[in-house]
Amino acid sequence: YGGISIGKEALKRFKEENFPNAVHISGYGNTLFGLCLEIDASPAYDLDYFPLGPRMIVQVVETDNGNVPSSERLSKVVNYEEEGQVVFHRLDESFFIPNMFERDRAVRIPPTSTAIEYGITQDGVRNPSLLENSKQVVKTGLY
């Protein structure tokens, strides 16, 4: 949420108590991959993000055998509504980045009807946050 993960209770407090009249715009991504936007505000205070356009692909892969990047893990995509490690792929003519394993975990979600109306047909991610074993060594925030 603006560069850091946020829990449902904190998000609810931000939207309803701290900043009830503000327009909340949330995004998820990084400088290399680009930005996935929150298309719909969730009544359950989930943060659902979808990549814009076919050149950006998000996968969520199993973490059963750890989170070390490997080509065999790329084929182990979790089912919808299951959590795993986020992997980005950016497929531009000028910027080709396949198989970028992130230090984040998230829930894999199918495109919503609103996302499809905007032409977004790729999977998205829900409630991204740091992988458990990354919390000890990773600084969070905007940098």
Predicted regions and their residues:
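Active-site glycine/GP-rich loop and adjacent strand/helix microenvironment
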Residues: 1-143
